Amino acid sequence: MDDTIDEEVISAGATITVEFSGGAETLFGGVKEHVVPLDGSKIVLLEEMLRWLRDNLLTGDPNLFLQENTVRPGILVMINDTDWDLMGETDYILQPGDHILFISTLHGG
């Protein structure tokens, strides 16, 4: 990761879109898509957004979504249609306009 990143404040009105699919939406009140403001934030890591989601939007059991400081195994995370493994996972720096998709790959029988 580049340690020379300028920590300017993100402009007012900046947002990211967070989407839940494959059953993950049931942990968030059945709402599939949320627009999350980044206003006034400095650099925001995906790990920080996960905590924000837990504290502000999660209505189900947090243990079904998070394990320690990351998502549970069985939840696929896509950042702008790219697997988060290729984007730095929880160290990814959120950008205004990002689309973060969480897809549960665990299904009952």
Curated annotation (Swiss-Prot):
UniProt PTM: C-terminal thiocarboxylation occurs in 2 steps, it is first acyl-adenylated (-COAMP) via the hesA/moeB/thiF part of the MOCS3 homolog, then thiocarboxylated (-COSH) via the rhodanese domain of the MOCS3 homolog.
CDD domains reported for this sequence: Ubl_Urm1
Record key words, sorted: Cytoplasm, Isopeptide bond, tRNA processing, Ubl conjugation pathway
Pfam families per the UniProt record, alphabetical: Urm1 (PF09138)
Record's subcellular location: Cytoplasm
GO CC terms in record: cytosol
Entry-linked InterPro entries: Beta-grasp_dom_sf, Mopterin_synth/thiamin_S_b, Urm1
Residues carrying 1-thioglycine: G109
Cross-link (Glycyl lysine isopeptide (Gly-Lys) (interchain with K-? in acceptor proteins)): G109
Tree of life domain: Eukaryota
Pathway given in the UniProt record: tRNA modification; 5-methoxycarbonylmethyl-2-thiouridine-tRNA biosynthesis
Entry keyword Transmembrane: no
One annotated GO biological process: tRNA thio-modification
Function in brief: Acts as a sulfur carrier required for 2-thiolation of mcm(5)S(2)U at tRNA wobble positions of cytosolic tRNA(Lys), tRNA(Glu) and tRNA(Gln). Serves as sulfur donor in tRNA 2-thiolation reaction by being thiocarboxylated (-COSH) at its C-terminus by MOCS3. The sulfur is then transferred to tRNA to form 2-thiolation of mcm(5)S(2)U. Also acts as a ubiquitin-like protein (UBL) that is covalently conjugated via an isopeptide bond to lysine residues of target proteins.
Family annotation (PANTHER family): RURM1 PROTEIN (PTHR14986)
Family per record: Belongs to the URM1 family.
Protein's name according to its UniProt entry: Ubiquitin-related modifier 1 homolog
Species, as recorded: Aedes aegypti
